[in-house]
């Protein structure tokens, strides 16, 4: 019986986190939290755009950030007009932000491992390539 409840708890927790992200965090400090994340990621992209060895990571990250920013603008515009717009898309938005954050972490890992010949670094790049 315990195992049957785990999925419900997981979904409920994700739903609560999604509502918190859209309802509180996104508007907190006039959106500066997400703006700061975007600036950090954009700076990383600019610094590493010419690195051929991690170009697939940078391209994936660029695409992901564009989607997050477009989705954020939509949420800000449509969520203000009708809160149901924001609430109904909160879980999808949470997933998008989470996957973008993971893409950023994989890109940073690839940069760190770039040019290192130890097997664990080569494995990290291969693993990251699989997930992005």
Give the location of each predicted region.
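C-terminal amphipathic alpha-helical interaction region
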Residues: 25-28, 43-132
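Glycine-rich phosphate/cofactor-binding loops in nucleotide/flavin-utilizing enzymes
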Residues: 1-50, 125-132
